């Protein structure tokens, strides 16, 4: 058995588990609040504590933990293990040598990877990407990230940055983004962007189920509320998802023209909207893309859910330990 720890470093929660990288099965899941506002050191110590808890829990099985993979919501240098930039996490996460810091404290090899690249690796190996030679994965949540497999190879690009689809420009001179650019996809189709559209609709006085679901408290509106209202048939909420899907479709169309994948996988919390989001994405792609054989492209939802990033992070740790 190949047992590795996979960790998902989320903006709200830190999640961790032991994964059997031969089967994709996970054991001993743990979760704790990230509480990023308390600072880097506090977050790092929570990660260290999760690793120690899992190492102890795994001891009874007789299988040793070989390494640790951490999916981070930003740009880690996969060679050096230094976090270069985390735009969606509070605090100064610039040039933080996270890999070395944690290795020193837990005595295990640690490998960093972008969180959505981890999801991509998990889905390709054990989920919705199985059997595909070339695919693209997008995860839509607090931000929008992606991952790429080309001709049977997990493609990471320069420094592991291939797949930053959330920062494709879909509106020139549009809204300012946390990355420093303007008009990025994240500003129009991420979870916070969808929530902001919901708040705007309520403030404009439109009658909508969105307001009822939060007892008219605008501060409680998030993407999950919009998705729920849309699933209950609310036309305003459905219109919001239609608009977000249009922007996603523009970005996906551009991606298709560059990579020409067999399969496009959609994951992340917002993908729980299912066809309410997938339909406008595919509609926009069909309207805008005319040089790719779209009848051969599959548009599917991720299968592994919240476990995809954990499995993928563990798989990445195995690859690094194997020298790949």
Descriptions of predicted regions:
Residues 3-45, 49, 82-85, 160:
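Short glycine-rich, Thr/Ser-proximal phosphate-binding strand/loop in the N-terminal lobe
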Residues 13, 71, 78, 261-284, ...:
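Glycine-rich phosphate-binding loops at beta-strand->alpha-helix junctions
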Residues 130-189:
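Glycine-rich phosphate-binding loop of actin/hexokinase-like ATP-binding domains
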